[in-house]
C-alpha cells in the first residue's frame, strides 16, 4: 500500500540491502524508512515535489499511476528521499477509499504479523487488516486518541542511507487520551520519553497567552512530539503532521518562499528552537525548526 511503495523507490535510488532483524517485540527498521503520506490533487503533485526538494534537497522518483488500496482506486504517486525525511506523495484521480488519507505516516516493520501483534497488545486497533501489494503487505492501525498510522513490510528489504536530521511526527491529542497514547506507543515502539513539559509555551501552538503539555518521544521509528491541547487551535496548528529540522531556519524559509511555499507564521523561539509553519503547493503544511530539543 501507501508507504509500502518505498520499496518501489528503492528501485530508483538503491539496491536491496541486508536482511531485516525479526524479533517478537522489536519491529522497527529505521527512521529513514518511515514515509510521510502526502495527499494532493493530481494537478499539484509535481508542484509540491519540486517545491519540497528545492527547499530541503533530495531526489524524487518518476510519476507512476497505480492502485495502492485494497479496494479499487487509482492514484499518481511519487516518492521523495531527502536529507530531512522520506515522503510518499499521492494524487488520486478517483475518490480515496476510506480510511486512506487519514493515516499520517507509513512505518516499515521487519515482520508484519509480529508488528500487528505488538500494536494490538499495546492498545492499538487494526482498522485496515493486512493486504498484499506487489512488494509485500500493508495495514493501518489506530492508537488511543484516534492517531492513525500505516505499517508496511517488504518482501525484499530496501536500503536507504541514514537521514541528516530525523523528522518529528507531530501528534495532537486531548488531555483525556494523551497518557494512553504515550503508553501504547512506547510499548509498541520500545521508545522513551525524552521530555515531558507540562507548561510548554503556547506560542508553539498559536496561543501565546496560554501553556500546554508537550511530550517528546524517540524510538527506532524516529522522533515524535505529542501536543496535548484543548483543541482551541488557530489555523494552521493541528493541520501539520510533521516537523522538519534544518541547520539554518532563515535560509530554509527563503528557499521555501522562492519555491512557491507560503510562510504561514513568523519564526518564533521556544523550547530551545526557532520554528515556523509553512504551506507547500498542494496545501501540505509543515513545521520547520532549527536547533533545540
Regions of interest found by a model, annotated:
Residues 17-21:
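Sec/Tat signal peptide C-region and signal peptidase I cleavage site
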Residues 88-92, 124-127:
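Catalytic cores of nucleotide-enabled group-transfer and carboxylate-activating enzymes in metabolic
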Residues 139-160:
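Short, structured interface segments
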Residues 3-16:
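Bacterial N-terminal signal peptides
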Residues 134, 156-157, 271, 292-293:
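A short acidic/small-residue loop/turn micro-motif
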Residues 241-249, 255-256, 262-269, 276-293:
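C-terminal functional regions that serve as terminal interaction/effector modules
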Residues 31-43, 78-79, 92-118, 137-142, ...:
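Vicinal oxygen chelate
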Residues 27-30, 37-84, 129-143, 171-222, ...:
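Core segments of cupin and vicinal oxygen chelate
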Amino acid at each position: 500500500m501507501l508507504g509500502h511503495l518505498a520499496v518501489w523507490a528503492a528501485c530508483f535510488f538503491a539496491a536491496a540491502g541486508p536482511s531485516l532483524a525479526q524479533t517478537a517485540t522489536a519491529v522497527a527498521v529505521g527512521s529513514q524508512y518511515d514515509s510521510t503520506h502526502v495527499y494532493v490533487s493530481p494537478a499539484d503533485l509535481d508542484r509540491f515535489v519540486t517545491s519540497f526538494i528545492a527547499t530541503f534537497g533530495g531526489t524524487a522518483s518518476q510519476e507512476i499511476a497505480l492502485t495502492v488500496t485494497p479496494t479499487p482506486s487509482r492514484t499518481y504517486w511519487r516518492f521523495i528521499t531527502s536529507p530531512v525525511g522520506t515522503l510518499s506523495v499521492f494524487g488520486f484521480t478517483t475518490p480515496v477509499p476510506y480510511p486512506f488519507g487519514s493515516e499520517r505516516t507509513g512505518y516499515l516493520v521487519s515482520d508484519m504479523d509480529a508488528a500487528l501483534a505488538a500494536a494490538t497488545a499495546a492498545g492499538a486497533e487494526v482498522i485496515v487488516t493486512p493486504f498484499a501489494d506487489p512488494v509485500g503487505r500493508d495495514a493501518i492501525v489506530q492508537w488511543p486518541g484516534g492517531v492513525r498510522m500505516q505499517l508496511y513490510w517488504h518482501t525484499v528489504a530496501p536500503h536507504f542511507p541514514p537521514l541528516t536530521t530525523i523528522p518529528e511526527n507531530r501528534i495532537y491529542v486531548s488531555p483525556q487520551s494523551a497518557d494512553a497514547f504515550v503508553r501504547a506507543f512506547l510499548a509498541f515502539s520500545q521508545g522513551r520519553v525524552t521530555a515531558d513539559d507540562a507548561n510548554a509555551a503556547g506560542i508553539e501552538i498559536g496561543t501565546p497567552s496560554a501553556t500546554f503539555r508537550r511530550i517528546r518521544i524517540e524510538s527506532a521509528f524516529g522522533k515524535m512530539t505529542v501536543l496535548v491541547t484543548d483543541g482551541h487551535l488557530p489555523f494552521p496548528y493541528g493541520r501539520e503532521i510533521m516537523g522538519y529540522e534544518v541547520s539554518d531556519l532563515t535560509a530554509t524559509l527563503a528557499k521555501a518562499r522562492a519555491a512557491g511555499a507560503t510562510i504561514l507564521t513568523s519564526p518564533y523561539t521556544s523550547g530551545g528552537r526557532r520554528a515556523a509553519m509553512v504551506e507547500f503547493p498542494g496545501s501540505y503544511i509543515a513545521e520547520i525548526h532549527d536547533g533545540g530539543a
